């Protein structure tokens, strides 16, 4: 390899940038009014043939001042109903439903600020290296203007209290009262099971985020 004629100290650092305000055009074109892909990304990943209980996950995302943010990109990644991810690295001896991709991408509504994911309820996931099984959960990743690095968090289910109490990730959160920021609330609406999961980016009610 030929050495550079000058040291790295002469290379200026690239300025950081946030994802917005045009994040939807590049990452969720259908939400910006551009139907340019055959299969546009969406938050509806529970096809008719997918095994599992149909659920709706919805919520709003608040900034540090308590205002609803309306331009956030939301991605989710989850196991199937048997607790297995559709990924080569997951080699559990559990049913792999190839019809369920487990990954969704959507955005908060420009008017209401509500994001919506239509999916199935995941099963418990085997723990790594002999650890206890992880309670059913959905992984979240957020990007928006004002956020330099995407934020990662998790959503757990309030009707899985026993499993949540044993979850190894929830239990590493030292301030036990903050674990509640990761618990979604169950309700029923028009015959559908709905879990409400609001996310707070900053402030006294800040959601727990993970360095992944």
What are these regions (language model features)?
Residues 1-212:
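Beta-strand-dominated extracellular/periplasmic modules and repeats
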């Amino acid at each position: 390899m030929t050495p550079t004629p000058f040291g790295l100290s002469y290379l200026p650092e690239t300025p950081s940038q946030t994802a917005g305000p045009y994040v939807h055009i590049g990452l969720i074109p259908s939400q910006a009014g551009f139907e340019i892909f055959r299969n546009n990304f969406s938050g509806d990943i529970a096809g008719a043939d997918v095994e599992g209980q149909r659920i709706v996950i919805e919520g709003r995302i608040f900034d540090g001042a308590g205002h609803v943010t309306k331009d956030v990109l939301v991605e989710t990644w989850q196991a199937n109903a048997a607790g297995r991810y559709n990924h080569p690295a997951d080699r559990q001896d559990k049913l792999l439903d190839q019809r369920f991709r487990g990954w969704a991408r959507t955005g908060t509504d420009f008017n209401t600020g509500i994001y919506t994911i239509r999916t199935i309820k995941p099963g418990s996931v085997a723990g790594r290296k002999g650890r206890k099984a992880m309670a059913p959960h959905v992984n979240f990743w957020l990007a928006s203007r004002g956020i330099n690095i995407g934020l990662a968090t998790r959503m757990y289910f309030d009707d899985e209290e026993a499993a949540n109490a044993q979850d190894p990730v929830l239990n590493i959160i030292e301030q036990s009262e903050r674990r509640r920021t990761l618990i979604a609330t169950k309700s029923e609406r028009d015959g559908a099971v709905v879990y409400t999961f609001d996310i707070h980016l900053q402030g006294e009610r800040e959601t727990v985020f993970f360095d992944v």
